[in-house]
Amino acid sequence: MSGHTSFYCGLLLLLLIQVQARPRADDSLQVLSRLLEDEYGHFNSEELNNEAQEISPAASLPDLNTDQSDLELPWDRESREIGGRSFRQEALLARLLQDLSNNPLRFKGRSKKGPSRSCFGLKLDRIGAMSGLGC
């Protein structure tokens, strides 16, 4: 068995030496850049710069004449919403517990036939039934 393993390892080593297995990152980057240029070549850098300049920096700033409610911080908004969330979570939890209490449990006991009604238990009852012994 070890002879076959060493033979296959040697064959693999010989193939790796012949192929000169090295990463070819330069080639893959060139291929990727060519593919991207083919796919998205219709976008020039000038067009991208023009589109970036069309979006004014003033449009990205918030309006200074807005309400105070618009300017509140995210954590303030979250703390205000916590009361509503906790009420919803409590209602959901109550409904879940009520559903669990109303529905019968799927697994009741050892088997579908009910509890064992024998004197000695399930395994001993089988042995007694086969041997003719009774309770």
Curated annotation (Swiss-Prot):
Residues 46-67 are annotated as: Disordered. Residues 1-25 form the signal peptide. Keywords: Cleavage on pair of basic residues, Disulfide bond, Hormone, Secreted, Signal, Vasoactive. The keyword Secreted applies. It is found in: Secreted. Belongs to the natriuretic peptide family. This is C-type natriuretic peptide. SMART domains: NAT_PEP. Hormone which may be vasoactive and natriuretic. Has a cGMP-stimulating activity. Pfam families: ANP (PF00212). GO terms for cellular component: extracellular region. Its main location: secreted. Coiled coil: none annotated. One of its GO terms (biological process) is receptor guanylyl cyclase signaling pathway. Disulfide bonds join 119-135. Residues 26-113 form a propeptide. The keyword Signal applies. GO terms for molecular function: hormone activity.
